[in-house]
Amino acid sequence: MHNKYVPELEERFVRYVQIDTMADDTSPSSPSTAKQYDLLNLLAEELNAIGASDVRITDYGAVLATIPGRGPRAHRAPTVAFLAHVDTIPGFSGAGVKPQVHRNYAGGALPLPEAPELLLSPETSPNLAKKVGYDIVTASGATILGADDKCGVAIVMAMANELLHNPAIEHGPVRVCFTPDEEIGRGVDPRLPADLMANVAYTLDGGEPGAIVFESFSADKAVVTIDGVSTHTGTAKDQMVNALTLAAKVLSVLPQATLTPETTDGRQGFIHCYKVVGNAAHAEI
C-alpha cells in the first residue's frame, strides 16, 4: 500500500484496538456482548461522517453502508462488498489495551513493557524477519492487541474514505459491512447475505498483502457433559465417580499425536479441546 495511507490506517487501528469488544461464547444474544456496540456504533457514526449512504445497524449487530459507484461504467459494474469483524477472541482480555508502535523495526526481539519476561522475536514469530524497516504495532504484554480483526476494520474504513473523496477513482457500487461474533462462529447471521445486497464479497481478515483465500474453515462443535457421583471423601470408597477424572480419561484417548491443531496443517482435520470446566460432580469438555 502506498505510504500516503499509512498515517490514517495507523490512527484508526490504534484507536479501534483500545475499544474492548471481546465476544462471549456462552451468551445467546447477538451480538454476544453489549460492548461490541461501542465500536459498531462508532463505525456507523464515522461512515455517516465521511459521506457513506444507507448507513444502518441491523438488529443482529451488523453495520451496513453503501459507497455509490462513480464513473460512466459504474451502473454496469457488479456490487462488491468488503467485510471485517469487530469482536475479539474470548478468554483473553481486550480491556485496557495499550498499543505500542515500534518505529522502523531493525530486527531482533521487541520488548513488551508490561510483560518484560516476554519477547516478540523472529524465532517465535518468523514473519517478523520479513518486516525489517516497517513500523510494528504490538500490545503492551498485559492484553491481546486485537489486530484480528481491527486491522481489517481500519483498512475497510480507510478504503471507504478514499473511495468517497477521490474523484479520480472510478468504481462500481461498494458495500461495507462490519459484523460481530466472528470469533465464536456466529459472524454471519442467516439474514446477512440478503441484507448485504452484493454480487461478490471479500473479508479483510488476515493473510499477506495480495493473497486471497477462497475457501472457508468449517467445523462442528460438541459439548461433552459428564455427570459424576459426588460423595463425602471420607466415605467415598466404591461410591464416588469423579467427573474430572472421567474428563481426563476422555481427553487421554483422543488422537493427540496426529489430530490436534499443533500436529496438523493445510486441509488436515483436527480435534481441538479448548475448555474444560467442572468439579467432581459435573464436568464439561
Language-model features and meaning:
Residues H2, V6-L9, S32-Q36, L40, ...:
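Generic structural signal for well-ordered, non-membrane alpha-helical segments
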Residues R73-P173, F178:
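Active-site metal-coordination/substrate-binding segment of hydrolases
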Residues V6-A34, T138:
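N-terminal capping segment at the start of a domain
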Residues E10, V14, N41-A44, V153-N161, ...:
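Predominant activation on well-ordered alpha-helical scaffold segments within soluble catalytic domains
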Residues V17, T21, L47, G51, ...:
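Structural signal for hydrophobic packing residues in well-ordered secondary-structure cores
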Residues L128-A129, Y134-A147, D181-I285:
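Midchain, well-structured core segments that form catalytic/ion-binding scaffolds
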